[in-house]
Amino acid sequence: SLGYPVICLDARHAKAALSMRINKSDKNDAQGLAELARMGWFREIKVKSMESRNIRARLIARAKLVDLRRDLENQMRGLLKSLGIVLGKSAGRTFSKKIINCLGEVPDLHSLIMPLFSVHSTLIEQISQYDLELKDFSRSDPTIKRLMSVPGVGPVTALAFISTIDDPHRFNRASDVGAYLGLTPRRYQSGELDRTGRISKRGDSLMRTYLFEAANVLLKIVRRGSPLKSWGTKLAKRIATKKAKVAIARKMAVILHCIWTDGTQFEWSRNAS
């Protein structure tokens, strides 16, 4: 309201600069931050819009409920396994059906499993409610529909990408998105030593998870051929499958950024490669 610009500093850079001081105190920190601002030795970070933060909050809440649901499923599966009952791989509503069948066959387990199962059923309903809200967001936004044209990318992944990037034009190159999301390998070079390590894992961990899951869907579930799927399949044969999925996730991030900025859709033809 006073007309002053609001600038947010990169906390990692500020911490590295302030760590040079011998004594840590609020006074020294305030003086150090003032010196950084005066000299301009700081990296400014993007302040996301309220809409992006609103979507992001829903995605985080949904992810937490999914984690709780998985933990409960593993807990019930472990309890039943200790009693000689093996449920096998399943999740969500399929897991609920197996639990109901199990309780029908062995009524004595009702007092043991039913309290956990009731919480599990509530979590499923709440996750479904979040899914409906996110789908409503995706239907009203043409950009999200175009992002969903990429094989393996659903409404949750598309919304997560929109809320994480917020402004696609702040990247000079589409390849910078991969580094921003922590999907590029770290590099250490000194003299004759030049070593490439694992991915940096900087940035949004939830977005990386969604892109990795999208890459997994592309390789294992999507049947329709595309240049992206062909490239990923060949890469998975040459290197470890997990590394290939990370590479596909990085390429997906670049493709999503290009689709967002160009106003195009995913091209399935060979000419698109």
Where in this protein do the model-derived segments appear?
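Short alpha-helix plus adjacent loop in nuclease-associated cores
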Residues: 4-53, 57, 95-103, 193-202, ...
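Glycine-rich, often acidic, oxyanion-interacting loops/wings at catalytic, nucleic-acid
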Residues: 60-146
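Short, amphipathic alpha-helical segments that act as regulatory/interfacial helices
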Residues: 34-37, 59-62, 66-69, 73, ...
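Short helix-capping/linker segments at secondary-structure and domain boundaries
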Residues: 41-43, 72-73, 127, 166-170, ...
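HhH-family (HhH-GPD) DNA N-glycosylase catalytic core used in base-excision repair
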Residues: 81, 85, 89-103, 169, ...
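Basic, amphipathic alpha-helical segments enriched in Lys/Arg and hydrophobic/aromatic residues
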Residues: 236-273
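Phosphate-backbone recognition surface of nucleic-acid-processing proteins
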Residues: 146-149, 155, 161-241, 273
